[in-house]
Curated annotation (Swiss-Prot):
HAMAP family registered for this protein in UniProt: RNase_PH
Listed GO biological process terms: rRNA catabolic process; rRNA processing; tRNA processing
NCBIfam families registered for this protein in UniProt: RNasePH
Catalytic activity: tRNA(n+1) + phosphate = tRNA(n) + a ribonucleoside 5'-diphosphate
GO function terms (MF aspect): 3'-5'-RNA exonuclease activity; tRNA binding; tRNA nucleotidyltransferase activity
Annotated PANTHER family: EXOSOME COMPLEX COMPONENT (PTHR11953), EXOSOME COMPLEX COMPONENT RRP41 (PTHR11953:SF0)
Disulfide feature: none
Entry protein name: Ribonuclease PH
Residues reported to bind phosphate: 87, 125-127
Keyword Transferase: yes
Function field: Phosphorolytic 3'-5' exoribonuclease that plays an important role in tRNA 3'-end maturation. Removes nucleotide residues following the 3'-CCA terminus of tRNAs; can also add nucleotides to the ends of RNA molecules by using nucleoside diphosphates as substrates, but this may not be physiologically important. Probably plays a role in initiation of 16S rRNA degradation (leading to ribosome degradation) during starvation.
Species name: Gloeothece citriformis (strain PCC 7424) (Cyanothece sp. (strain PCC 7424))
Length: 242
């Protein structure tokens, strides 16, 4: 029997998205990213220094952190204090890699940008929402530096966005929620640039296997969703006054 989406979306339809920019008064760039019932607070902090391996290089750096609040899921999760889980480390490395791909570090100069992504509510897709929202926080931070004259030209090369896709009952679906994520035989996280080049493809079969044709279908579906997200990102950045 064909899979019926719990929220009645079409297979190629994103969940409702909303970007509340300037969410934090203390950060140079911030956004509360809504993706369906998933909520991720993304903030950008700029520090006037770089890691030791970049000292006197004239180049900047970007790093990212990811955390999930204890109350973000139906059952409370313990805070990660002294040691991060393997999952958390993997996700924040993914976010950092994805956002570094969009920066010209020579234009940024010797500054470090820290992107903090905190999951307030999780209904699947937290890492992809963190990347998509993280780019908005980054874009707002760069916009501010340009406005105040700390940068003469933007170090942003291309926007970056991410989305999940999966196979359920052998059929491809875009932007899985939690119920769909747990039912999927195959699920992928796909990260792309504004010119639709791939930055990262994370995917696995939870049961069985999948064909090259199905892989191509999933990537095409991800591209469709990412094109929509890229437009929404740019609208959020352009319409924000700091």
């Amino acid at each position: 029997m064909p899979w019926t989406r719990p929220d009645s979306r079409q297979p190629d339809q994103l969940r409702p998205i909303l970007f509340e920019t300037n969410y934090s008064r203390f950060r140079v760039g911030s956004v509360l990213a809504h993706c369906g019932e998933t909520r991720v607070l993304c903030t950008a902090t700029i520090q006037p220094n770089v890691p030791k391996f970049l000292l006197n290089s004239g180049k900047g750096w970007l790093t990212a952190e990811y955390r999930m609040l204890p109350g973000a899921t139906p059952e409370r999760q313990s805070r990660e204090l002294m040691q991060l889980s393997g999952r958390t480390q993997e996700i924040q490395r993914l976010i950092g890699r994805s956002l570094r791909a969009c920066l010209d570090f020579e234009r940024l100069g010797e500054r470090t940008i820290i992107i903090d992504t905190d999951v307030l509510q999780a209904d699947a897709g937290t890492r992809t929402t963190a990347i998509t929202g993280g780019y908005i926080a980054l874009g707002l931070a760069i916009k501010k530096l340009l406005e105040v004259g700390e940068l003469q030209e933007s170090p942003l090369k291309l926007p970056v966005a991410a989305v999940s896709v999966g196979l359920i009952e052998g059929e491809p679906f875009l932007d899985l929620n939690y119920a769909e994520d747990t039912a999927a035989e195959v699920d992928f996280n796909v990260v792309m640039t504004g010119n639709l080049d791939l930055i990262e493809v994370q995917g696995t079969a939870e049961s069985g296997s999948f064909s090259r044709l199905q892989l191509n279908q999933l990537l095409d579906l991800a591209q469709t969703g990412i094109q929509e997200l890229l437009v929404a990102q740019q609208n959020a950045i352009n319409s924000t006054y700091q």
